[in-house]
Swiss-Prot record:
GO terms for cellular component: endoplasmic reticulum; endoplasmic reticulum membrane. The chain crosses the membrane at residues 28-48, 57-77, 84-104, 117-136, 140-160, 168-188, 206-226. Zn(2+) binds at H77, H205, H209. It is a multi-pass membrane protein. Its EC number is 3.5.1.-, 3.5.1.23. One of its GO terms (biological process) is ceramide catabolic process. This is Alkaline ceramidase 1. The keyword Zinc applies. One of its GO terms (molecular function) is N-acylsphingosine amidohydrolase activity. It comes from Danio rerio.
Length: 266
């Protein structure tokens, strides 16, 4: 049992040179780059609070769980232990599961599910089973992650097909762009390590951490906005960016502008 907590007990080893900057930290840059989770998560919790207060305070669980993703990511890259790997991957699964249960469109629920509470219980049950199964067969977590992610992407594509709001479409394209950049860094670090070692630039996985947090901020706000437009249209949800709404780069969030019943085309 102690072996799963041992340094470098994981089969995964990223491109960054081990113990290059510290004798106690296996992957220093990958560990330090995980700090971005602790910067962005509290800001998003604050920015999305008006929406969460009106819609469901459970929305905060997404970004609270992202803090745990950051903690476990730091632990994993600091030790490259098998337990660190499992905690890192499972925390990501729980972020997806929480978002899935909160924001999956009601109109796409299976016929045997009558309300969101029942849907959330179903998702919770599947996630718990996947979590427990992962400690027996680690690939179970990968299957669950892919199932949630693919279904979320498909549902989002269906929702955006009928959307004509330019600000929403801009946010969608920004989310896709950040996600593509993040995945490209992950794949390149994982499978193109020899090339980056020749250039003495083995930090793409750390850059992935930064990009995926930003992609999550953009994508979760997009999904939350579509949800607000359907579930609480009377609140007149609108998109803005922090710290300045007219800046080219910022963190997107939802503002609620009114109480009259109305709805945009999204």
């Amino acid at each position: 049992m102690a072996g799963v907590f041992s340094y470098e007990s994981s089969e995964v080893d990223w491109c960054e040179d081990n113990y290059k900057h510290s004798e106690n930290v296996v992957e220093y840059f990958n560990t330090m780059s995980s700090f971005i989770f602790f910067v962005i998560s509290p800001i998003m919790l604050y920015l999305l609070h008006p929406y969460a207060k009106e819609r469901n305070l459970a929305v905060h669980l997404v970004w609270i769980m992202m803090v745990f993703v950051g903690i476990f990511s730091m632990y994993f890259h600091m030790t490259l232990s098998f337990m660190g790997q499992m905690l890192d991957e499972l925390s990501i699964l729980w972020v997806l599961a929480i978002g899935y249960s909160l924001w999956f469109p009601r109109k796409h629920f299976p016929s045997f599910v009558k309300d969101r509470t029942s849907f959330a219980r179903l998702v919770l049950t599947i996630t718990i089973i996947s979590t427990l199964s992962s400690f027996v067969k680690p690939t179970a977590n990968a299957y669950a992650l892919n199932c949630f992610a693919i279904h979320i992407l498909y549902s989002l594509f269906v929702e955006l097909k009928s959307c004509t709001d330019e600000r929403v479409l801009r946010l969608a394209w920004a989310s896709i762009g950040l996600w593509v950049l993040a995945i490209s860094c992950w794949i390149s670090d994982r499978f193109g390590c020899s090339f980056w070692q020749k250039l003495d630039f083995c930090y793409l996985h750390g850059i992935w951490h930064i990009l995926i947090v930003m992609a999550t901020a953009y994508a979760s706000t997009l999904i939350a906005y579509l949800d607000a437009s359907q579930e609480i249209p009377y609140s007149l949800p609108d998109l803005q960016y922090w710290p300045r709404n007219n800046w080219a780069i910022g963190l997107p969030y939802i503002v609620l502008k009114g109480t009259n019943t109305t709805r945009k085309t999204c």
